Curated annotation (Swiss-Prot):
PROSITE patterns in the record: RIBOSOMAL_L21 (PS01169)
UniProt-recorded name of the protein: Large ribosomal subunit protein bL21
GO cellular component, one term: cytoplasm
HAMAP family: Ribosomal_bL21
GO molecular function annotations of the record: rRNA binding; structural constituent of ribosome
UniProt keyword annotation of Signal present: no
PANTHER family membership: 50S RIBOSOMAL PROTEIN L21, LARGE RIBOSOMAL SUBUNIT PROTEIN BL21M
Alphabetically ordered keywords of this record: Ribonucleoprotein, Ribosomal protein, RNA-binding, rRNA-binding
A matching Pfam family: Ribosomal_L21p
Job of this protein: This protein binds to 23S rRNA in the presence of protein L20.
Length: 103
């Protein structure tokens, strides 16, 4: 059984016990997170109807917060000597899917 869920503006394919990195969510480590399923596949049966999906719930446990790779930004204007160098590291939340079940 697996599900496609919406997490942080993106779609992720998850199954039970998967560890997934999603955009940052304001939750502490150990908290429970409920994700919205967009599609559920259960033993070859595909469920994508909105009325049927309301019967399913995907739960996950928050493992912690991690940072992504550093992105380097350089602004430059020719003939003026203007240079500006910036860096950014995006924060992500790591979760473990604990269950995909009907309500």
């Amino acid at each position: 059984m697996y599900a496609i869920v919406r997490a942080g503006g993106r779609q992720e394919k998850v199954s039970v016990d998967d560890v997934v990195t999603i955009d940052r969510v304001a939750k502490e480590a150990g908290d429970t997170l409920n994700l919205e399923p967009l599609l559920v596949v259960d033993n070859g049966k595909v469920v994508s109807d909105a009325a049927e999906l309301n019967k399913y719930q995907v739960t996950a446990e928050v493992l912690g917060e991690v940072t992504g790779p550093k992105i380097k930004i350089l602004k430059y204007k020719s003939k003026t000597g203007y240079k500006r160098r910036l860096g950014h590291r995006q924060k992500y939340t790591q979760i473990r899917v604990t269950g995909i079940a009907a309500k």
